[in-house]
């Protein structure tokens, strides 16, 4: 986690009653962010790892084993994922991306930056994409997309937030369940 934790909180709540999926750990690269507070409040263990440790196989993989992590959901995590983790969790790690891929992905395409790019492009719709994590930023196979028309009333990308959050709420449960329970390679 890198930020506000809306995705994190909704995923934890979605799976809170599940007998098949357990959110075992929330990892962040910044201390004191709302995502950590939300996870703590919901009873999910948290860890803060600086960027240097997130890139160390000898730190990250033992932590994953300690918490018996079988599947990873990147929900607002803004760092590039190291190759060793991608190999270890091949087709067991998904990313929630705040725009329609492949058009609006890659380095720098997050948060308000991606929404500004969509607005500047003149696109008629926006949305959210869930994809498998690969060695290319936002380049993994697409699992699901949810689309919504861009209203002329949305004067700026910041006015898209409520609509974007509504899409994310619909998308999270469906695709997380699909990915965790129904898809294997």
Roles of regions detected by a PLM:
Residues 1-185:
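One-carbon transfer enzymes
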